[in-house]
Amino acid sequence: MKKLNGKLKHNIAVFLSGRGSNLKSIIKYSLRKEKFYKVKVVISNKQKVKGLSIAKKNNIQSYCIDFTQSKRLGNKVLNILKKNNIKLICLAGFMKILPAYFIKSYKGKIINIHPSLLPKYKGLNTHKRVIMNNEKFTGCTIHYVNRFLDSGKIIIQRKVKITKKDTSKSIEKKVLKIEHSIYPKTIDKILSIL
């Protein structure tokens, strides 16, 4: 934990599998003096993704370890997190399911952002399914991670209106915009009470 302006900053880890757009907004928000966290570690299950480049550009430790199918590699990741005093794991476009033993090690301290208004549209291809079902609204959900897919306790949701002109791409852009706004603030709020 780092002390800044008399406040303690909690170390967080961000897990991702791709472009890292949420990572970028989380880092930017965390750099404000009065915020409660610092991105200390980034873990990706894929090599050569933009998210790892964003981490390196911001001098954040980053690792490419596809650990979800190997307990040995999972323990390696847990050791990295422990060594860096990680208080919260934030999944941001992490496209793997965490093993039960891993979730148990950080019980109540892993959150995820999902691009739908859960419990509707768990899993992949949410925007296409929203259009197919003629939904009037969609949005994003931040929730605690448990052993079931996109089923943990909901922390916060934000919705956006769907118009007749919307496509899955335009909906993705709308939802991503609100994700970038609420995810960093929600992380800060959770850590402010730890």
Sequence positions of predicted segments:
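One-carbon transfer enzymes
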Residues: 1-194
